[in-house]
Amino acid sequence: MQDKILKAQRRVYLSTLYIGKTEHELISTVRSALQNNPDLHVSFLTDSLRGTRETPDPSSASLLAPLIAEFGPRRVEVRMYHTPNLTGLRKKYIPKRINEGWGLQHMKLYGCDDEIIMSGANLSSDYFTNRQDRYHLFRSKELTDYFARIHDGIAKLSFDIQPSNAEGAGGYSMTWPSSNPAPSPLDSPSKYRESAAKHMSHLLTPANSPPTASSSSTTTIYPVLSFVPLLKTSTELPALTKILQSLATAPLHPSTWTFTAGYFNMTPSFRRLLLATRPASGTVLTAHPHANGFFGSKGVSGMLPAAYTHLAKTFL
């Protein structure tokens, strides 16, 4: 990824839950790319709750803000999405580590010019050094353009980060731009949802891909997305449902499938659909409890690994 960032000439966009507060090597790579390529524009999109959790101590926001100070907001953009589900007294009193359960920006899209890495990994040391995760590299201008529009669409519905020297600010300020197509989710959650739905709905249906010359390729890409709670519908649920239903019918029956998940919290409907396929063989790959990021943590979160293990046993 660092090599692709350094070679990028026009654009880099990075959508992730958060960037580790000690990822100075990644920031140094982005800085070098901006210095070497004067036409390069870099856009970061993270989650607000997770990206500012440690404030006023170092956080994703404080790590990224100096890039804006150095290269200016026209070349470096840092946006942080905030769920409209967490406002008022709920936001004030729910502990920070728990409040993320009310909604997050969870896309992992790492685009450089006309290539994109679609991943499940955040940009932090644990994921770089101690996690097994998916990294799919696509060399496709059409696909990279499409997800750039998704990234930009959510960025325009997010808070803007700027550097700040104010005492206790943690090195950054977070404001809601007047140019955003929706009011702040903290000021008017219902109007935010309504405006956000209008802004994002057209992006769920990409334009038809241009016809291509016949080839031996057997790979077809179907982008599926879930923008809950911004939209009441998603393309993720119907697409996965259709695929699983198809596996239970001829000529795909009996089929072979592999189900992978870091956290085994399969919904009842997906569980029924998977079991209904009566596969020739089925493989479930999930994390061992000791490999779970919540293993050994204090409070309710420390109970999650055992809960996922229980769900896996129930499935078997």
Task: Label each residue range with its predicted role.
Residues 265, 278-285:
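Classical protein tyrosine phosphatase
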Residues 272-277:
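Short, solvent-exposed amphipathic alpha-helical segments in soluble enzyme
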Residues 16-18, 260-263:
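Structural motif
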Residues 9:
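A short acidic, Gly/Pro-enriched loop at the edge of an enzyme's catalytic core
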